[in-house]
């Protein structure tokens, strides 16, 4: 987590775990 990753629409869903958690608003 050194730098913020671009928003990933594929991760636009409620996830409690995984890298997608950083993408959900």
Curated annotation (Swiss-Prot):
It comes from the Eukaryota. The record marks 21-22 as: Reactive bond. GO terms for molecular function: serine-type endopeptidase inhibitor activity. Keywords: Disulfide bond, Protease inhibitor, Serine protease inhibitor. Residues 1-25 form the BPTI/Kunitz inhibitor domain. Serine protease inhibitor. Inhibits trypsin, elastase and plasmin. Does not inhibit kallikrein. This is Kunitz-type serine protease inhibitor RsTIS5.
């Amino acid at each position: 987590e050194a730098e913020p990753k671009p928003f990933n629409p594929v991760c636009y869903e409620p996830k409690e775990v995984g890298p997608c958690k950083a993408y959900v608003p």
